Amino acid sequence: MKSTTTVEPFETVEPNTTNREDVSQLGDAPVAITRYGIPVRVSSATENGWEVFDPCGDLQTVSKIVPIENTQVVLDPGHGGKDSGAIGHAGLKESVVNLKVAIATSQLLQDKGFPTFLTRMSDYYISLDERIALADAANAKAFISIHHNAPASAASNTPGTEVFAQSKDSESARLSGLLHKEVFEALKGVKGVQWTSRWDAGALRVLNSQGSDAYRLVRKPETTNALIEVGYLSSPSEGAFMAKDEYVQIVAQALATA
């Protein structure tokens, strides 16, 4: 673990063979939650417990884990810890809003019978590569990275929701379209918010100069994925709305419905 990373501590372990299983018994998705509530990839069972990859992608040893199996949806709350993302109304951090939306969405999906897995469950930094590795290790059907945009764009009568898909993946395009439709329609019905939007907002595919997907979180995962910028946290009106529990529930319901 790099010293600059803010994260709940990994434990110092002593030899202990209780609560251990062979890593092969974790099934096709060797991911787990540590006793500190940190989602991790599992490398192997050892005499001292388990070797797992921490949020920086470094190997650490822990004495106890809770295996997570049969995941259908991985939710990735963007940013976290030293990487706060956009800063909005009254200092509201994007990383905090992303996490609230992800947790609420996870609960709704679980209630519908869809097992979920979050790449982070509190406010700490996790590398892009480890987010991607967690999503692929979970062997889920979908990976959704949740974000909020900045800087503010032009004033609009409708939300500026953007969802990015893998350029060569039809399932990613379908997922992005469904996410955009549900979130856009849910937010469009909210009264009293001055929206902002780019002219081309929607379900998008964005390429870099090499002709591949511009965003690493879209380009790299093998899991069907989409990255959503729900709205503009940097807009004073939208930012004030995003600070409310009402906003979190509206967006979570839309994401879970998609």
Regions found by a protein language model. Name each.
Residues 1-258:
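Catalytic-site microenvironment of enzymes
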